[in-house]
Amino acid sequence: IFNVLSKKVRLEKRKKYLHVALNSTLEEAGEIISQLPASDRILIEAGTPLIKIYGTEAISRIKALAPAGTYIVADNKCTDLAAREVEMMANAGANASTCLGVAPIETIDSFIEECQKFNIDSMVDMMNVESALEVLKKLKKLPNVVMLHRGVDETEFSTEKQIPFYQIKQIKGNYDVLVAVAGGDTIREAQRAVFNDADIVVVWKNFYQS
């Protein structure tokens, strides 16, 4: 099971990335991927709905559809049994796996450790976390990526919920990690993420159809 260890593409701190989330069907994923330019700065995500529908095959299928060497994110949103989940995502071909910041600290610690073991990047998704710094302070090791995330339902049903752009500089001023921003549906929000020094901007269907 460890034959994947030497083949993984990893993120680099000096680069900025566009992260394209695919959440609908594999057919639609193929259509979107075919329109993307080949670039080491484009990350392609097997979204949570795809993984729930197709299992880990969603990851391997998206990897097959994308140009060789494309960085694939498995958005499994781990909340428990981190060792098992990371192994599954890595063996399916993912370059990164996600864990929720609201998960038990023990789970996040295990998740980060297992990602290191399988030579994939760890992404901790801070959706519904008031302060990412407070979570990071409790961890034994840092993840590769901290994701500030306003959820789809939050965006749709709450006009008051804002993406915490101010936390980007707080996190990067205290920790040597990459910061991703997810949940922006407009070009303006993507621009704000870049202006505030986000390393990764996550977009999904609503964004690139606008």
Stretch-by-stretch model annotation:
Residues 22-26, 74-83, 125-130, 178-188:
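Glycine-rich beta-to-alpha transition loops that act as phosphate-gripper elements at the mouths
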Residues 48, 101, 126-127, 150-151, ...:
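Short secondary-structure boundary segments
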Residues 42-58, 150-157, 205-210:
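Glycine-rich, proline-tolerant flexible connector loops at the mouths of alpha/beta enzymes
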Residues 1, 111, 194-195, 204-210:
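C-terminal helical cap(s) of enzyme catalytic domains, especially alpha/beta-barrels
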Residues 12-14, 81-174:
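Conserved anion-binding
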Residues 1-73, 78-83, 141:
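Conserved N-terminal beta1-alpha1 strand-loop-helix module at the mouth
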Residues 35, 61, 88, 138, ...:
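Well-formed, non-transmembrane alpha-helical positions, independent of function
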Residues 15-19, 41-45, 71-73, 95-96, ...:
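Structural preference for beta-strand elements that scaffold enzyme active sites
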